[in-house]
Amino acid sequence: MGNLVTHLLDRLFGKKEMRILMVGLDAAGKTTILYKLKLGEIVTTIPTIGFNVETVEYKNISFTVWDVGGQDKIRPLWRHYFQNTQGLIFVVDSNDRERVNEAREELMRMLNEDELRDAVLLVFANKQDLPNAMNPAEITDKLGLHSLRNRSWYIQATCATSGDGLYEGLDWLSTTLKNRSKK
């Protein structure tokens, strides 16, 4: 009964639920971001084999965030998480210049998947606190984001350990998805 009341109140007051898939190469900071958003603190992480899933409440939206491991051997499993994904968060290690082309290839491969054709894209240009980090404009260029047609996308500079930029990214995601659901 309590769940029914909560569900009705959520519907009355416009609480939205959104399924978000967070991917990126290994060591980009996905798990650190997930738990910074969920717990507000830095947690010690180990490479994710499989996935972590958490619900993050923000601005009357319940984001179900799937953080999927990024090691090359398990990237083929990403597609198993595509169904019903409304938003894709692609996390890039802004300091990893050697692998930015690999990140681009993985991103473009995913964006060509039919199941993700309607998903909006948020890129977290993570690790901006590091001295040699590429800025968002450089990452936009290296990922080829300007070539994307018929897809809403946004890039946000972030630092997972301090939390800088994370909520700005969620703001864009929530606004974009809310506007889309009104159509």
From Swiss-Prot:
- NCBIfam families per the record? small_GTP
Q: Which cysteines are joined by disulfide bonds?
A: none
Q: Does the keyword GTP-binding apply?
A: yes
GO CC, sorted alphabetically, is: Golgi apparatus
Binding-site list for GTP: 24-31, 67-71, 126-129
The cross-references to SMART domains, in alphabetical order and at most eight, read: ARF (SM00177), RAB (SM00175), SAR (SM00178)
Q: Which GO terms describe its molecular function?
A: GTP binding; GTPase activity
Lipidation sites, kind N-myristoyl glycine, are G2
Q: Mainly localized where?
A: Golgi
Q: What is this protein called?
A: ADP-ribosylation factor
Classification via CDD domains: Arf1_5_like
User: What is the protein's known function?
Assistant: GTP-binding protein involved in protein trafficking; may modulate vesicle budding and uncoating within the Golgi apparatus.
Lineage summary: Eukaryota, Metazoa, Spiralia, Lophotrochozoa, Platyhelminthes
Asked if the record carries the keyword Nucleus, the reply is no
What the record says about family reads: Belongs to the small GTPase superfamily. Arf family.
Extract the Pfam families matched here: Arf
User: What are the UniProt keywords, alphabetically?
Assistant: ER-Golgi transport, Golgi apparatus, GTP-binding, Lipoprotein, Myristate, Nucleotide-binding, Protein transport, Transport
Q: Where in the cell is it found?
A: Golgi apparatus
Offer one example of a GO biological process linked to this entry: protein transport
